């Protein structure tokens, strides 16, 4: 495939994914209809299969796109030198990114699509995003896998509680820094004892 043809194909895929996100914002991530998507992008539904061999392939492209957006957000961060402050800023960016777009949050951080699992290539992007947080946790003194799991679970729990009970607000997410401090202090204290 020549560069021009490949570039046009990639541009078409990107535009289809953009429209799929618009539909997901309107109908929820599980509410995307391939028929409606085809209509919105000006093609017949069977023509979508030239770009995505299944609805799961579309979700996979969206999963990759969302995680690329997240990684771009992280790459733009100016992190402070202090490890604890850097971790808080990184996790705040994670939470803010999730709260900005409920449909994207559903696909990237929750399990709203029965049977969907991202491809290894797409999942590697999610692992890279989480890997940045884990690196900062290590620098802040959180090195035990159980302690890392607690920070991840706490962050995800705040996102879920916020999205479910106070979308657009900050009732739960405003406690992020306080809970990060508690978990870091606990992890450091327990590591000193052992």
Spans of features found by a protein language model:
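Alpha-helical DNA-contacting segments of helix-turn-helix folds
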Residues: 59-66, 108, 125
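Helix-turn-helix
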Residues: 15, 19, 23-57, 61
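N-terminal intrinsically disordered/low-complexity leader segments
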Residues: 1-11, 191-194
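Amphipathic C-terminal alpha-helical segment
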Residues: 152-170, 184-193
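Hydrophobic alpha-helical connector segments
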Residues: 61, 75-103, 126-128, 148-151
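Amphipathic alpha-helical packing segments from all-alpha helical-bundle domains
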Residues: 71, 97, 115-152, 174-182
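Amphipathic alpha-helical segments used for helix-helix packing
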Residues: 99-117, 160-166
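Short hydrophobic clusters on alpha-helical segments that form packing/core surfaces
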Residues: 16-24, 66, 70, 94, ...
């Amino acid at each position: 495939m020549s560069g021009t043809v490949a570039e046009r194909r990639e541009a078409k895929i990107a535009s289809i994914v953009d429209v799929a996100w618009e539909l997901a914002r309107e109908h929820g991530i599980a509410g995307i209809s391939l028929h409606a998507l085809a209509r919105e992008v000006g093609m017949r539904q069977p023509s979508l299969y030239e770009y995505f061999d299944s609805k799961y392939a579309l979700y996979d492209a969206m999963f990759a796109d969302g995680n690329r957006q997240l990684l771009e957000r992280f790459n733009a961060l100016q992190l402070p030198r202090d490890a604890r402050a850097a971790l808080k800023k990184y996790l705040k960016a994670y939470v803010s990114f999730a709260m900005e777009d409920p449909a994207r949050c559903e696909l990237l951080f929750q399990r709203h699509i029965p049977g969907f699992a991202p491809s290894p290539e797409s999942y590697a992007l999610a692992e890279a995003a989480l890997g940045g947080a884990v690196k900062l946790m290590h620098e802040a003194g959180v090195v035990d896998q159980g302690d890392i799991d607690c920070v991840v679970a706490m962050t995800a729990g705040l996102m879920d509680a916020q999205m479910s009970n106070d979308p657009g607000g900050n009732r739960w997410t405003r406690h992020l820094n306080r809970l990060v401090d508690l978990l870091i202090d606990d992890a450091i204290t327990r590591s000193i004892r052992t």
